[in-house]
Amino acid sequence: MERYLPVSKKRNSSSSLEKITGSANGNGTLYSEEDTNLEENDFSWGDYLEETGTRAVPHVSFRHVEISIRSNFQPGMKLEVANKNNPDTYWVATIITTCGQLLLLRYCGYGEDRRADFWCDVIIADLHPVGWCTQNNKVLRPPDAIKDKYSDWTDFLIRELTGSRTAPANLLEGPLRGKGPIDLITVDSLIELQDSQNPFQYWIVSVTENVGGRLRLRYVGLEHTESYDRWLFYLDYRLRPIGWCQENKYRMDPPSDLYYLKLPFEWKCALEKALVLAAESPLPMEVFKDHADLQSHFFTVGMRLETLHISDPFHIYPASVTKVFNSKFFQVAIDDLRPEADKPTMLCHADSLGILPVQWCLKNGVNLAPPKGYSGQDFNWVDYHKQRQAEEAPHFCFKNAFSRGFSKNMKLEAVNPVNPGEVCVATVVSVKGRLLWLHLEGLETPMPDIIVDMDSMDIFPVGWCEANSYPLTTPYKASSKSKRKTVHFKMEKQLLSPVPIEKIPHELCLLPPQMDSPVGAINAKYCCPQLFVNHRCFSGPFLNKGRISELPQSVGPGMCVLVLKEILTLITNAAYKPGRVLRELQLVEDPEWNSQEEILKAKYGGKTYRAVVKIVRTADQVMNFCRQVCAKLECCPNLLSPVLISETCPENCSVHTKTRYTYYYGKRRRVIQSSLRVSNIETPPKSTRRRKRRKSVYVQKRRKSAIVVPAGVPAGVPAGVPEDIPAGIPEGIPASIPESIPEGIPESLPEAIPESIPKGSAQKTEQEKRETLDTARKKTGYHGPAYQTDTSAAQVPFARPRRAVTLRRNSEALKRPPVERARRVRTVPTTASSNNRVKGPLVRIVKPEDSSQSDEEKLILESNPLEWSVTDVVRFIKLTDCAPLARIFQEQDIDGQALLLLTLPTVQECMELKLGPAIKLCHQIERVKVAFYAQYAS
């Protein structure tokens, strides 16, 4: 007898869809979790997986979900599409791949050349079935780029179209245009449902709810009764189109256990009414195109097996084949040795879930529940066969088991078998063959672990409920086992000037700028194409290029919100300061977007940052959204793009470095030039008014890292730099470094350094310079080497250095070469490169003849470090004992200006170096700094 289970009402207290919008007071303020108890309402799969140290089951493990998001269009189909350069003419194109309502097309004639492939939206693109141009007197003309490739295009088309598949006309025109299979199933759609016990009996059911292809069905005639609703995935073999029963000459009767609820004429009237409605609006046959054909079975009556019954998914029982209907269906009954027992039965086919060969439990170490009425303590198949005189079902009768990516402790979403309307967070407790033992989280009444087949259509990947706007039963207080310290942004209400975005057309990826969205938009509309992280592109001042290169090459395809949220999370965690990136992402919005608010989180320095970001929901807005994000982060517009850039970026972004750039898409920056190159250009005097310091949005930090400063050195002066060094620095160092440079890199050299070295110091003797440095050590009370990085335990909190206001010095002094002295000189060999901006040796290493052997050799700069390119910096690092670290400098685009700004905390944090290598590297950097001050800072 079929068992009907009550349908629960949707929960509204622990729904994963409830977001913290943080806009209750109208100014976008986010509040701390320490003052509010939001753990139960704000469930986040990302946080939950991180806190439990678990992983999600891969999406590809859920075959039924993967099929449900497929398009009705198939790769290889032909259609006619308007030419891009001449919309009045058309040409035949081939579908390369699909993503929801987006098609990747290639004009016939390009062969295997992918350079002209382009995306289009089925909803708004000018697409037609093959033959449409002939019927409507339209011109078929090949694109200009290949028009000379063939002399006879008519003959080419005949050969190209012979034996090919054409896109169905109903998918390109009319109400079905651009819709996927699950989008075609609407509320009140009518379907025939096979009886659970009799394969030759059907009854019509009405769809009352469609949740991502999971259908809530109600029997016709019981429209006002919810108690007998059924939940089935649309791919279930029991669902058939209207007319299937009559076509195969089966019976059309309601289930026998429901027949008593209505009078016979009431059932008949309900059936006639349903058939009329089905004839008026039939369900498209495309809904059933992915239904698997049932295979023939080899079972006979009396065969023994082990089975998992649908009404008791907690145990595996011995069972027998009690009836064979035909080559497709047979009946299995759970063994019960009690006299006159009502044995539970179920209708099965060759690929039914939960039927297993004899001894399967023994081989897999699983407990086999003995039949009711069994006298022995431990069930034994050998004794049981002798008593019952029955044969085992051969192994070839059963479906082969194979791994689908499930493993212990993985997370997923699963249907509660006691309440089919409830979907819960589930944990894989055990994997045995093709069966999974799942523990359902968050249930009010504890339940034993349930057993499901890997191919069950009642299990779903992480995020499925959220993607389909359905409530998910979550673990109580799952968001936090203990109070966590989180940092939020409080954005002040202000008028922001619109950010200009330069829109550059891409021939390879043509996405529509806007699309009208009707009520009840189809699910395929929300499918995002594959997005690439082009790590070769310029990463801008916010993002760490080294970390960008370690990210996955692409994300998606999938639902827009999920794909974009994932890629934004990856980008945020690849930033120097994730908090600043989150703040920028909060400003990415457009009033014309169809967007929803999502919470992005990032961890940095032992704290959690979160921000509410608006993410577009439709595929046609993905391109514009990615460009706006890139504009806010001041990186190349192609860093995030549906197009993979393997070689040269069309934006020519490789010319930019972290400290030398002129225009970015969205924000204007001053051209940075070295004073050596602008010495002959008159410039107006710079304002000495200090820029107002931006108010920090961060809370008090833990003293994760500190700068060691000897007693007496003013705050902000790098360790080892004499106090007598002038405050001014050449114009080559910008007056304001981008705010995204990681903490620890000063925004300018400190202005607290007094000017005690005169401008003519470049012409002093080496002995006089040494005396000057000794005087500085006496003033500060510091007697170590002038360029040595102090690593003692005396620590002071890191303070953000003040901006320098006096940046100009006589540029002519910078041109004076250092005075040669009589001493032993060792010139460091360099690698010749035609691309280096600084030619010849970068440095010379000099050791005075009268010095002791323990004294370190002195560094003499042959060129101004402010002019060093990234290649020059890499050359210098390779000449030191830190040569293995040269790759990091190359990856992170560190040029001479950035090199002079590096400090020990910055090197440890941004280059992710341990203390030992970081100290060695800073030692070499300090040598360059001291030499720079002595030779060029006057």
Swiss-Prot record:
Intervals holding MBT repeats: 43-143, 151-255, 265-371, 379-475
Repressor in keyword set: yes
Domain SAM as annotated: residue spans: 868-931
Chain intervals with Polar residues compositional bias: 13-30
Xref: SMART domains: MBT (SM00561), SAM (SM00454)
Keywords noted in UniProt: Nucleus, Repeat, Repressor
Span list, region Disordered: 1-32, 742-836
Tissue expression from the record: Expressed in testis and, at much lower levels, in ovary.
SUPFAM superfamilies: SAM/Pointed domain, Tudor/PWWP/MBT
Gene Ontology cellular component terms for the protein in this record: nucleus
GO biological process, one term: negative regulation of gene expression
Coiled-coil stretches: none
Composition skew (Basic and acidic residues), residue ranges: 765-777, 809-822
Pfam families cross-referenced by the UniProt entry: MBT, SLED
MF annotations from Gene Ontology: histone binding; transcription corepressor activity
Subcellular localization: Nucleus
Remarks, miscellaneous: Imprinted gene expressed from the paternal allele in blastocysts and in embryonic tissues early in development. Imprinting is lost in somatic tissues after 7.5 dpc.
Function, as annotated: Transcriptional repressor of HOXB13 gene.
Assembly mode: Interacts with YY1. Interacts with methylated histones H3K9me2 and H4K20me2.
Protein name, per record: Scm-like with four MBT domains protein 2
Organism: Mus musculus
